[in-house]
């Protein structure tokens, strides 16, 4: 007999399960388009040169130690991260009504923000986009939200943002509902609202007294321009809207396993900040208590040293540019093959992911017959493509959509 008898086996986390399937595959030709991480033209992880140089500098700095950071995190990092997403000239910064909280990457920021809203502010209803990142619903359910609902985001027939239903669903949301918005490079679709559409979304959220929770995991990585990628967030701030923003530095700094994140908070009344920070400290104390220093030190040094920041800008532009080239190459090969269906959405999307429109049956066929590994909803990581495998992937998709029919 065990205290743990009868515990059911949970289904595997798909993205990591598919990644393991790829690693275990013994076929001589295989392609991994699953896990959300950047890869070079050679298919390898990339340590940004500026990150490596900064790590060496930190390692040689004998003034540093391993004492605990404050509960809310590395002060310089928090300030730099908040300025990165809001802009140094943001009214929220100038009026001292914003601040950052260091968290364990984007997931930790989502969890801390969600738990705070549920336990301190008694917000229990959240809306996430349909489709959305696979972890959003789980995080908010575990944080204490009792209603986790969807708003329409994707037009599956026309492969575009379904702005009409998006706005209609927001209109129907109860007052004080939390609305999760992807700041840029929507995961999994890779398609963002236009600036005019963002303005419509902001108008409804403000008028209906809904609460905005932005999740921005790809700032700078999406377009190569950190300011452009944060446009929607800065517009909402300019409209006088309160919000929290989950930031991740996994993709744009390549610091996946350092778990570097920030929760930027924007309020309308600076007088509430002391209470907010004190209650947030209790939320974090009961979770990870104190955040790790290494990744935060790297990001802080890079963002606050002009020469290093310029190096970082060049790196994110290089990553963004390679992704765009691979999108164009995949589309070109599909067009050359005369692949049935419409595929222009591949180059209309941004960031590392493409929501291909492939069905689950077609995904199973691609994996079984071509050893091209991707998620069941048809999401592919464009970073997994390179000049050596993109034609193979296009031919695999072409054979698959001819063999396994759908309405693409």
From Swiss-Prot:
Binding site for L-aspartate: 36, 133, 187, 379
One Pfam family hit: Aminotran_1_2
GO BP annotation list: 2-oxoglutarate metabolic process; aspartate biosynthetic process; aspartate metabolic process; glutamate metabolic process; positive regulation of glutamate metabolic process
Enzyme class: transferase
GO molecular function terms attached to this record: L-aspartate:2-oxoglutarate aminotransferase activity; pyridoxal phosphate binding
Reaction(s) the record says it catalyses: L-aspartate + 2-oxoglutarate = oxaloacetate + L-glutamate
PROSITE patterns for this protein: AA_TRANSFER_CLASS_1
Positions where N6-(pyridoxal phosphate)lysine occurs in the chain: 251
Function: Biosynthesis of L-glutamate from L-aspartate. Important regulator of levels of glutamate, the major excitatory neurotransmitter of the central nervous system.
PANTHER family cross-referenced by the UniProt entry: ASPARTATE AMINOTRANSFERASE, GLUTAMATE OXALOACETATE TRANSAMINASE 1, ISOFORM B
Stated family: Belongs to the class-I pyridoxal-phosphate-dependent aminotransferase family.
Miscellaneous comment in the UniProt entry for this protein: In eukaryotes there are cytoplasmic, mitochondrial and chloroplastic isozymes.
Protein's recorded name: Aspartate aminotransferase, cytoplasmic
Species whose genome carries this gene: Caenorhabditis elegans
């Amino acid at each position: 007999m065990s205290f743990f008898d009868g515990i059911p086996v949970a289904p595997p986390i798909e993205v990591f399960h598919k990644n393991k399937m790829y690693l275990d595959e013994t076929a001589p030709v295989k392609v991994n388009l699953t896990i959300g991480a950047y890869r070079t033209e050679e298919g390898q992880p990339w340590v940004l040169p500026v990150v490596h140089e900064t790590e060496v500098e930190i390692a040689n700095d004998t003034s540093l130690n391993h004492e605990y950071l404050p509960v809310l995190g590395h002060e310089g990092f928090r300030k730099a991260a908040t300025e990165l997403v809001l802009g140094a000239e943001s009214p929220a910064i100038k009026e001292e009504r914003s601040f950052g909280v260091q968290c364990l990457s984007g997931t930790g920021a989502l969890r801390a923000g969600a738990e705070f809203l549920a336990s301190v502010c008694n917000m229990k209803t959240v809306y996430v986009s349909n489709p959305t990142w696979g972890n959003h619903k789980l995080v908010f359910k575990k944080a204490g939200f009792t209603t986790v609902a969807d708003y329409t985001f994707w037009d599956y027939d026309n492969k575009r943002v379904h702005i009409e239903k998006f706005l209609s669903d927001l209109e129907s949301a109860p007052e004080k509902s939390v609305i999760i918005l992807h700041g840029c490079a929507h995961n999994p679709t890779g398609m963002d609202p236009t600036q005019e559409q963002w303005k419509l979304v902001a108008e409804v959220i403000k008028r209906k007294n809904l609460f905005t929770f932005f999740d921005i995991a790809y700032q700078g990585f999406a377009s190569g321009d950190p300011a452009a990628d944060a446009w929607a967030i800065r517009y909402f701030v300019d409209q006088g809207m309160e919000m929290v923003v989950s930031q991740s530095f996994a993709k744009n700094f390549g610091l996946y396993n350092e778990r570097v994140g920030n929760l930027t908070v924007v309020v309308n009344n600076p007088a509430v900040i002391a209470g907010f920070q004190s209650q947030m400290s209790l939320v974090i104390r009961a979770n990870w208590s104190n955040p790790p220093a290494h990744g935060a030190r790297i990001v802080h040094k890079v963002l606050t040293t002009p020469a290093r920041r310029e190096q970082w800008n060049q790196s994110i532009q290089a990553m963004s540019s390679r992704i765009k080239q691979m999108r164009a190459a995949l589309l070109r090969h599909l067009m050359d093959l005369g692949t049935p269906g419409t595929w222009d959405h591949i180059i209309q999307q941004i960031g590392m992911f493409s929501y291909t429109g492939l069905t689950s049956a077609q995904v199973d066929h691609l994996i079984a017959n071509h050893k091209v590994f991707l998620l069941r909803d048809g999401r592919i990581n464009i970073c997994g493509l390179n000049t050596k495998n993109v034609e193979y992937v296009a031919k695999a998709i072409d054979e698959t959509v001819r063999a396994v029919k759908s309405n693409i």
